[in-house]
């Protein structure tokens, strides 16, 4: 049986999974990838760091699992989205990659909107500092040399694939987050490019996520003792790969990612844009479908922030919150845990976190509950916007670190009034999705079958009886906080 490697380039690290033809994970390797925060609101990484860590992971797999690696047939990638990777003619980075959660380009968002008033209709989203185009404008003002020497603009996973193959390319899902592509047509838009100070000549070929993008370089095959030529598929943005990893490739299926950020991704057969609600709808990695995404800027990141503040682990805080909720939630504070701004549905990148109703008797358990509930309510606000635009949000599977707290998932299930399945190996869903794209590139006639594979869930979380009414009462208070300066 042949194996397939799925690389997940995340914000916090690199993971690689070796997956068999049935979608089962056979081996993994991972490395942490620190984020550089040189100024408040900034968030960046060195692209070379991603490549070095990828090599370390493959070195580990080759050393510990040589028999498995010898059966490797194809590789594909999932990557954190929106970060600009500018490369010179020698394919060397000209500047650090400004990440998806960076806030430095707020002023440039207004400039883009002024230059292209209908930008929301073309890109299905309003300008946000995390997106790629505003960053290009910011670099024009503050680091022009990085732009002057740049020969191509790529996205994070594209740089790793370039190092694997020597070939430049990007895919339609990652391109959709740049604000340089018309999301309805799936093509680069020259007016958007001009508004961002960029040009088509400095863009890579635009490919489908499951398309072959090259072969693994010969020297890497030798380094890892691979027997045959290894195909490398284009890959996709992480939210798309995570959805594919749980079989969310056909209309009516959805994926709920509770990671550093949070994303509710729903597969749709039709294009239902909702740019006024900051819901991003783009072509999916499963060709012929669309993915509607409601984004929570800080999900587990909000709990991690409170963990640092209280010198308590995130897991312990989640447990304390569950105990507090069992005693009643009416007296708990209400929070807007938007420590990195708000995306869906209010599009307020400048928003800060708020706790309301804190009293002398409250403790870290109350604050922990308020954070978990606040994130759940942000998911619910995005869900309402998606449903209002005509997107089916059904058959939800939850992945990401937040699923380690079934209580947290139960808050979301109660608000959405639907059961949520937690799949086995949901923590590597993006790796699994990338591996499936590698399989599809190797056997294109089975693409629909491969991308839609689903396994029985590890756990199904039901709405808590009687909780929804209590949460909706508190949701009204939460929504009032949404528009507080």
Q: Where are the language model's segments positioned?
A:
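Gly-rich Lys/Arg/Thr-decorated short loops/hinges at beta-loop-alpha junctions or inter-strand turns
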Residues: 34-44, 119-120, 169-176, 199-202, ...
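Active-site core segments that coordinate phosphate-bearing ligands/cofactors
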Residues: 5-6, 106, 110-126, 130-131, ...
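Conserved small-residue
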Residues: 16-18, 23, 75, 102, ...
């Amino acid at each position: 049986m042949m194996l397939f490697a799925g690389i997940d380039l995340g914000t916090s690290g690199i993971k690689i999974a070796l997956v068999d033809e049935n979608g089962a994970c056979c081996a993994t390797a991972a490395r942490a990838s620190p984020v550089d925060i040189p100024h408040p609101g900034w968030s960046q990484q060195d692209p070379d760091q991603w490549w070095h860590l990828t090599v370390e992971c493959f070195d580990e797999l080759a050393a510990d699992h040589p028999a498995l690696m010898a059966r490797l047939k194809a590789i594909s990638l999932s990557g954190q989205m929106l970060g600009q990777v500018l490369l010179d003619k020698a394919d060397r980075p000209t500047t650090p990659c400004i990440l998806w959660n960076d806030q430095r380009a707020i002023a440039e968002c207004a400039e883009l909107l002024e230059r292209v008033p209908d930008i929301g209709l073309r890109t299905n989203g309003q300008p946000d500092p995390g997106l790629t185009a505003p960053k290009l404008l910011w670099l024009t003002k503050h680091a022009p040399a990085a732009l002057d020497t740049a020969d191509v603009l790529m996205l994070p996973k594209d740089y790793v694939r370039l190092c694997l193959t020597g070939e430049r390319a990007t895919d339609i899902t990652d391109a959709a987050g740049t604000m340089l592509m018309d999301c309805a047509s799936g093509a680069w838009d020259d007016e958007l490019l001009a508004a961002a100070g960029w040009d088509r000549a400095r863009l890579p070929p635009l490919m489908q996520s499951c398309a072959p993008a090259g072969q693994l370089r010969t020297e890497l095959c030798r380094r890892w003792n691979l027997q045959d030529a290894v195909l490398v598929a284009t890959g996709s943005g992480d939210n798309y790969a995570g959805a594919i990893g749980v079989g969310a490739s056909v209309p009516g299926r959805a994926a709920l990612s509770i990671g550093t950020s949070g994303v509710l991704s729903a597969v749709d057969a039709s294009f239902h844009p909702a740019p006024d609600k900051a819901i991003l709808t783009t072509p999916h990695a499963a060709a012929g479908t669309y993915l509607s995404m409601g984004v929570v800027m800080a999900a587990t990141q909000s709990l991690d922030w409170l963990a640092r503040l209280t010198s308590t682990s995130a897991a312990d805080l989640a447990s304390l919150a569950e105990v507090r909720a069992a005693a009643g939630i009416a007296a708990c504070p209400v929070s807007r845990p938007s420590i990195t701004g708000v995306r869906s549905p209010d599009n307020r990148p400048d928003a800060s976190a708020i706790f309301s109703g804190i009293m002398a008797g409250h403790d870290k358990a109350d604050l922990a509950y308020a954070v978990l509930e606040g994130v759940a309510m942000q998911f619910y606000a995005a869900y309402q916007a998606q449903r209002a635009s005509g997107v089916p949000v059904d058959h939800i599977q939850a992945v990401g670190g937040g699923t380690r707290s079934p209580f947290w998932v139960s808050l979301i299930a109660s608000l959405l009034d639907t059961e949520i399945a937690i799949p086995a190996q949901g923590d590597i869903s993006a790796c699994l999705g990338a591996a499936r794209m590698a399989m599809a590139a190797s056997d294109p006639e089975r693409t629909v079958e491969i991308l839609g594979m689903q396994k029985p869930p590890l756990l199904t979380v039901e709405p808590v009886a009687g909780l929804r009414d209590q949460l909706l009462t508190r949701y009204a208070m939460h929504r009032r906080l949404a528009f507080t300066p």
